[in-house]
Amino acid sequence: MLKTFNSSARSCRAMPRFLPTLCSRLHEKSGFEIRNAVRMHSVGSHTHTHDHGSDKEMLELVKALKKEGKSPELKLAWLGLYSNIGLAAAKGIGGVALQSSILVADAAHQLGDTLSDLVTLATLKICSKKPTQKYPAGFGKWETIGTFTVSGLLVAVSVGIAHSSLSRLYTILFPYAGSEHTHIGHSHNPSQLLFEHPFMALGLIFGSVVLKEWLFRKTRTVAQKTDSNILLANAWHHRADALTGMVSLLALSGTYFLNAPWLDPFFGCLVSIVVFSAGFNSSKKAFLQLLDRAPSEELRIAVTDALLKGEKLPYKIVTILGNAHAMHVIISVPPSFTSQQSSELAQKVEKTVLDAIPALSSCIVTPLSSDSNQVHRWQHLNGSSGEHSHPSHEHTH
């Protein structure tokens, strides 16, 4: 019976890893309100319909990383990272000692948060490298590969959670069949240690909820003072951890005090669907980026806004290609321009974009004569007579 409970515990804790991601993506488009996280939750995207809103979050993260090492944003970011490591260690030791899958799963969740943050920081460091002779377009796709890998693992974990939860739920609902059902390396007998010391497990989870809620409030306060979007996203990560920790706490309490072991695998099944949706949508987005899909509207707005605020020059933006780390901007110039004038204009546009968007390590600007066949081809592809006219274009959010 406890084994069933343990299985769902694992599933319940898988939810936290996904919820923070959802809350972060969503805050970008919804003013960081938790209700958006719930909505995104149901859609199951960056669930990017989270689109990982991610490009905007990535731009904000790079801004924060470029600040001084003692900035409030980085201090709290590292505090959150250390708290995840501490919680993972405490829950892992407690879970093994009490033979509690819910604590072990909780520890895995905290460790998953930590690994995800480290992967993000590592890929950002790689992506920030300047283009080389071997990689003239920069290293921007490393971030996409990292996202694709982590999302793939998330999908695999969700499938494992679903299988384990359904198996234990079946055993509880049909005990006559479950009595003959065994797994290699374990049985479905309840853990006596956990039932003898339930408050130790409950205390560890409750403590993590309190810590995460405290981190949420402190981080949100600093984020509002510093007007830091990325820090506000991080705050909602902590709130999501606290809320989903409450779900695990309720599942564990119900299993023990109400003698309802089915709660754990039941919640595990629901969570596995949400986790799978998150992983699938993030993987899909990363896969499409590897296929050089058009950049998100967020990136296009960032580039056009940067150019609108820059020096007024005689050109039009034909199209924008690339990702949050490496962009390719094609512009049209007057037919009367010489090759030297076009080259100088392209250099000015490139500098304007790179200065305005710190996340970019590479920006290639290709000038084309406005009466050339290539410009007409791009205009036809974009379905317009010209994407943007820089001198007169008015952009609104």
Curated annotation (Swiss-Prot):
Q: Which SUPFAM superfamilies match?
A: Cation efflux protein transmembrane domain-like
Q: Which taxonomic lineage does the organism of this UniProt entry have?
A: Eukaryota, Fungi, Dikarya, Ascomycota, Taphrinomycotina
**Descriptive protein name:** Uncharacterized metal transporter C1020.03
Q: What keywords tag this UniProt record?
A: Ion transport, Membrane, Transmembrane, Transmembrane helix, Transport
Membrane topology note: Multi-pass membrane protein
UniProt keyword Repressor present: no
Specify where it is mainly localized: membrane
Q: Cite the GO molecular-function annotations of the record.
A: iron ion transmembrane transporter activity; monoatomic cation transmembrane transporter activity
Q: A Pfam family this protein belongs to?
A: Cation_efflux
Membrane spanning stretches: 142-162, 191-211, 242-258, 260-280
Record-level GO BP terms: inorganic ion homeostasis; intracellular monoatomic cation homeostasis; iron import into the mitochondrion
- Report the source organism: Schizosaccharomyces pombe (strain 972 / ATCC 24843) (Fission yeast)
A single GO CC term for this protein reads: mitochondrial inner membrane
As for subcellular location, the record says: Membrane
InterPro entries xref list: Cation_efflux, Cation_efflux_TMD_sf, CDF_Transporter
